[in-house]
Amino acid sequence: MKVTKYLPILAVCLMTTGCNSKKEAVLTSGIDLANLDTTAMPGTSFYQYACGGWVKDHPLTDEYSRFGTFDMLRENSREQLKALIAELASKTDNAPGSAAQKVGDLYNIAMDSVKLNQEGVAPIKAELEAIDALKDKKDIYAYIAESQKKGIRPYFTMFVSADDMNSSMNMVQTYQGGIGMGQRDYYLEDDEQTANIRNKYQEHIAKMFQLAGYDEATAQKAVKAVMNIETRLAKAARSQVELRDPHANYNKMDIETLKKNFPTFDWDTYFTISGLKDLKEVNIGQPAAMKEVADVINTVPLEEQKLYLQWGLIDAAASYLSDDFEAQNFDFYSRTMSGKKEMQPRWKRSVSTVDGVLGEVVGQMYVEKYFPAAAKERMVTLVKNLQTSLGERIKGLEWMSEPTKEKALEKLATFHVKIGYPDKWKDYSALEIKNDSYWANIERANQWDYNEMIAKAGKPVDKDEWLMTPQTVNAYYNPTTNEICFPAAILQPPFFDMNADDAMNYGAIGVVIGHEMTHGFDDQGRQYDKDGNLKDWWTEEDAKKFEERAQVMVNFFDSIEVAPGVHANGELTLGENIADHGGLQVSYQAFKNATANAPLETVDGFTPEQRFFLAYANVWAGNIRPEEILRLTKLDPHSLGKWRVDGALPQIGTWYEAFNITEQDPMFVPKDKRVSIW
């Protein structure tokens, strides 16, 4: 899920199949030998062999629970953003209402800890009192709708996005939620670590209520009320694996049917306050969860619901209040749950806020300074090389029939590719940044986001809209638009290196591109057609063969012990593992195509093929705390970095050839037991 900053000369060489790069630049291997641990054996743990030196040289600092090459790029990006933002924040003549004024003022407000500490709980006091004043269930429904506008999401989440069955149109949808720990397992499982986190959460709730000015007795009542409601919501929620099934989470209905299916939910009040009075249809993602929401609202005493709603407000606002709120918030969510030891400095948190609120304003400045426009077209050519490679692989699949191949190739040919930055930027003119409280500005920003979102309901999908900002170090595939997107910030080493040859670049950014393409054909993506509709285009026999091959991947990752007594979740991580697998296969073939007429030489003692796999492994170098391993294993659809290497490569035949891996090596998997899909 990554890409890289690159410059013209290398880009031309990388993207012109068979071009002789030696004529244009003196290139290196791009592999930092210091990253290696040459005492390790490639066939015992390729991750340790390729990344052991990096891991040793980059011990975790207190502000991180996990730190790897992605985080290094994010740190670099954040420094760049700081320079851009701080320059505007230092000016006193920014025109009122201008982008410069909004960026500069929001940063200064976020940095003003003196004012924040003077205010204490004051910025949310009136809202807490308003919750106290709620008189009945109708008021509860009205408050849910109002609070969602401000970025607070009690009970459930409502959003607008493409209709999976009619992907050209946007639709209002609901999604389970309303639980402070975010994942249902924290409420339902009873192992020692989960039980400890649950106990710490209750202590956290009590401390936060007391910081907000409530006495201990009220704080303890709040703990009981919150845990009662959130545990009920958690029991009704779907698991992380169940949420990956697009058909199970598609339950579109007209408003008449909605009211019939959920008769005790006051939809009229909710939709009127939400600004959706004339809504015609909605998708209820998880019906059992929504039924429980209605049951909770109708059966839990009003006073307990008020405490739950007040907790939602306190929890949402904590990061934008005084230091004592921030410290307590960090203590639970970061220290207890993830193992972090120290909060990031205020400037980093402030930059992140400005980036989150005014992402495309900051992104436009970032692109103008750090990403040349010409790079966009060169990247498009590289993507086309990978598309060609994936097409070749699809045509050569022995297990797939011709009718399904034809549909797969049609889908591949219609990929919508986004590189670097959007062609059209968002208009933030309606967003006001004022010199009042930090939280008030965050609420206005959330209201602006909400208004923009609601305006899309029932309207055509804008396929030119970006779901990430240019300064985001990541990449994505969106099934309903059949698009792959590579923001500018990921276009830099170690993902792409202008001074390195094709072996390194195809091993790193090439695999990233192939990874995103393969998402269009993983266990979820394969269920969407070329137009982004949830529609079966597979023959029954081919679908069965795919599922059988995917199960091999599930079983392999289920067998991996990520911590003592804790195994990876092969079903949860299936889509990402298939994408890694496909990315490696597709990019390796593209690499061989690109160098067929001008073979690369051995450099630094490594063949081109070896450098390809070393570059891939180096992308996943990182350190991680035990608490974070356990947390991510519960909720993250991505495998841990180590296993994106040691779990992925044993399935790749060309890796065995490159490093002479044999039956005697611990990582060896017999050929007939390996995953073989794309």
Predicted regions and their residues:
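Bacterial N-terminal signal peptides that target proteins for export
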Residues: 1-7
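Hydrophobic/aromatic-rich, well-ordered segments within soluble, folded domains that form packed cores
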Residues: 35-56, 187, 191-210, 402, ...
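Intrinsically disordered, low-complexity linker/terminal regions across diverse proteins
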Residues: 226, 261-264, 283-287, 344, ...
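C-terminal motif of bacterial Sec signal peptides marking the signal peptidase cleavage site
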Residues: 15-18
